[in-house]
Regions:
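Non-catalytic beta/alpha edge segments that cap or flank active sites
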Residues: 1-163
Length: 163
């Protein structure tokens, strides 16, 4: 039996929830990609683009001991895009190289607005938190870049010699 890559939580950030809509399959797509990569997904939460809800969801994952939290959405430049700001408040240590890798892999895939994403990546306790833009293309490309980097970081955090 293969050892799981880690436990994960997905947090979909969308104002569509306020209007009674869902996250348009973003959480399901992230779940599918993480499971394919060997992660055990503990759950998928959907919250509106509000600091309190986002912070609560992130803290739920950190306190619950998941290895990886992937937020989807709310990474742009509008006043309602607060996911990176809240994430920056929750993390203990930033991983700006991974955030830049996400932006540049999007650019390489032809998503020219990828560099406008304000998404951050960092560690809170022993949990990696990563912000990914909400489009299906951004999710697919972002997870392809994020998963091996997150695995490496999770391995470092769980190694008693390195950690």
């Amino acid at each position: 039996m293969t050892t799981p890559a880690g436990r994960a939580l997905i947090v979909s950030v969308t104002d569509d929830l306020v209007h009674g809509d869902n996250d348009h399959g973003a959480g399901a797509l992230v779940t599918e990609l993480l499971v394919e990569a060997g992660f055990v997904v503990d759950g998928s939460l959907a919250v509106p683009s509000e600091s309190v809800g986002i912070r609560s969801a992130l803290n739920t994952g950190v306190i619950g001991g998941v290895d990886l939290i992937v937020t989807v959405g709310g990474t742009g430049v509008t006043p309602r895009d607060v996911t990176p700001d809240v994430t920056a408040e929750v993390i203990d240590r930033g991983l700006p190289g991974i955030a830049e890798a996400l932006r540049w892999s999007g650019m390489a895939a032809g998503v020219t607005d990828a560099v406008v994403s304000r998404g951050v990546v960092g560690v809170s306790g022993s949990t990696v938190i990563a912000n990914v833009a909400g489009s299906r293309a951004a999710i697919r490309d972002g997870l392809a870049t994020l998963i091996p980097l997150a695995r490496h970081t999770i391995d470092e955090l769980s190694d008693p010699v390195m950690g």
